[in-house]
Design a protein with these regions (language model features):
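Non-catalytic, mostly N-terminal accessory regions of nucleic-acid modification and defense proteins
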Residues: 1-181
Length: 181
């Protein structure tokens, strides 16, 4: 493992640790790269990008669902989220207490988190492809995405760290969405 880590590119490495300036997105991405660099399942920049992407996608999707739900409520309508409750970001990725902070008693970590992601979350999301009414639906696209990738993060503690960094990001305003691009 030590020789594997020595051969890994350092992404943003030590230089990033000395820089705290930058946008919240830049800071989060540096922290995510630093966390993934330590994981034995992520051995290249391509791995960092793929793993960061699926996590960001699920956070983005949950923020989008939250906005749609709020808009429906303002119009006196009911909105049913695409993702079942137990697979929504605030339930599995970053459950919060009444104070709005991460509830460490409910938050999965270590082998429990990796087990949930690999054995429940990914199979659930892959199943969207079969349930979709057509290839142009968001459900089909979700299923297609999660049929093509896998969770490579082996440490549930690393994954917990990455989830917390991503959770600090929000994709609710146009400015926030633009910053991500």
């Amino acid at each position: 493992a030590a020789s594997q880590e020595a051969s890994k590119p350092k992404a943003n490495g030590a230089a990033a640790k000395n820089k705290s300036n930058g946008t919240p997105f830049e800071t989060a991405f540096r922290n995510i790269d630093d966390a993934l660099w330590k994981d034995p399942g992520c051995t290249s920049e391509l791995d960092y990008t793929e793993q960061t992407s699926w996590i960001l996608f699920l956070k983005y999707l949950d923020d989008l669902e939250t906005v749609k739900q709020m808009e429906a409520e303002l119009q006196g309508k009911k909105y049913t989220p695409i993702i079942e409750a137990k697979y929504r970001w605030p339930v599995w990725a970053c459950p919060k207490g009444k104070d709005g902070k991460l509830d460490h008693h409910k938050a999965l970590s270590g082998p429990d988190l990796v087990g949930f992601v690999n054995q429940q979350l990914f199979p659930y999301l892959k199943g969207f492809k079969q349930k979709a009414t057509g290839p142009n639906t968001i459900e089909y696209k979700i299923g297609e995405i999660f049929s093509e990738i896998s969770n490579r993060v082996q440490s549930g503690y690393t994954l917990r760290d990455v989830l917390e960094h991503v959770d600090a990001l929000h994709f609710r305003s146009q400015e926030e969405k633009h910053e991500l691009s």
